[in-house]
Amino acid sequence: DAGIYLTASGEEIKKFNARDGLAMSRLNKNGLRVAILSHSKNIDIIRKRADMLGLETWYAGQEKKSLILARWAQEYGIPPESMLYLGDDLNDLDAFRYVGVGVCPADADPLIKKHAALILESKGGEACFRELADRAFRDLLLFEP
C-alpha cells in the first residue's frame, strides 16, 4: 500500500500481505527463485520477512535495483530476459528496463505503467503478488512439496 508506519518513538513498521507471502513461499519451494528487492532503510524488517518466507535472495538498501538484479543474474546464472520484476514506483524503472518482463499493480506510477508488460487489477499491498502468481504460476501454487 506504499505506506510507511511510524510509532511515536520513531520505529518503522511495515505491513505485509499474508496472501502475497503464501504465494512467494510456495513458488520458492517449488523451484522458482523468488526475491525481495527493496529500497527500505530498515534492513531488519526485510530480512525478517525474507526469513519468514524461506527466501534466501533479498536486498534492502539504496543501491540501484538494476545493479542488484545484474548481480543476482550472474550469481544464479539467470539471463536478465528470463527475469520477471514486480514494481510500482519510479525507483523501479531501472529494474523494469533490465528484466525481460516488468509487472506493476493497478496504482503504480504512470511511467511504470507505461513500461509494464502487465498491469495487475490489484493495488499495491492488496495481494498483487498473489494475483500475478495466480495468473502465471497457478499449478505451482497448488502443489505443496
Model-derived segments and their meaning:
Residues 1-33:
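Active-site neighborhood of HAD-like aspartate-dependent phosphohydrolases
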Residues 2-7, 46-53:
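Short, basic/glycine-rich phosphate-binding loops at helix/coil junctions
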Residues 39-40, 62, 106-109:
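Short secondary-structure boundary segments
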Residues 44, 62-66:
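Feature captures the catalytic cores and cofactor-binding loops of soluble hydro-lyases/lyases
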